[in-house]
């Protein structure tokens, strides 16, 4: 909701006056609503659900990529939709193991992006996406990246600021302090 509102407002569209947005809690609800609405319907779906919907709904096209649209209107942040979180106490008590985990995590991301066919098999085997061919098609569009340190802090803090500006409760009522960002 906040991401869509931000992008719309930055493009001169008032989401409360210029259009009607109907939010759904499940991607399957969105796909069903698209099918019921017919031609001209518009939806926002994350990957891999957009790829799944395209396999079910003939003529369904991606006309806007939220990451690309975010980058057009925001120069001081990135659209961050997934992060790794750990308690400070845990990291302090297990620093070497945590650093090793981060290296493995980064390698895993690089492997997934370089080996989409093999990664898709794993994604399907673990039930993340129903079928490997669907996962293989969706993975390149998932924008799976590894960012850490000062770069991560800059990207994430800018994103959190956008959320905070719309609704402070979206980030727990206050912007996180510098100690929130590991290795920054």
Give the ranges of each region predicted by the language model.
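Secondary-structure end/capping motifs
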Residues: 91-166
């Amino acid at each position: 909701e906040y991401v869509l509102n931000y992008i719309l407002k930055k493009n001169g569209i008032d989401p409360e006056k210029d259009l009607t947005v109907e939010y759904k809690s499940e991607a399957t609800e969105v796909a069903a609503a698209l099918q019921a609405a017919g031609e001209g319907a518009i939806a926002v779906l994350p990957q891999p659900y957009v790829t799944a919907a395209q396999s079910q709904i003939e003529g369904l096209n991606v006309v806007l990529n939220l990451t690309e649209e975010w980058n057009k209107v925001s120069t001081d942040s990135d659209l961050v939709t997934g992060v790794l979180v750990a308690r400070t106490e845990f990291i302090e008590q297990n620093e070497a193991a945590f650093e090793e985990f981060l290296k493995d995590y980064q390698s895993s991301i690089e492997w997934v992006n370089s080996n989409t066919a093999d990664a898709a098999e794993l994604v399907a085997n673990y039930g993340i996406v129903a079928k490997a061919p669907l996962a293989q098609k969706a993975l390149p569009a998932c924008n799976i990246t590894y960012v850490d340190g000062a770069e991560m802090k800059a990207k994430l803090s800018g994103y959190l600021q956008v959320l905070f500006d719309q609704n402070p409760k979206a980030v727990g009522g206050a912007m996180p302090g510098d100690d929130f960002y590991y290795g920054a």
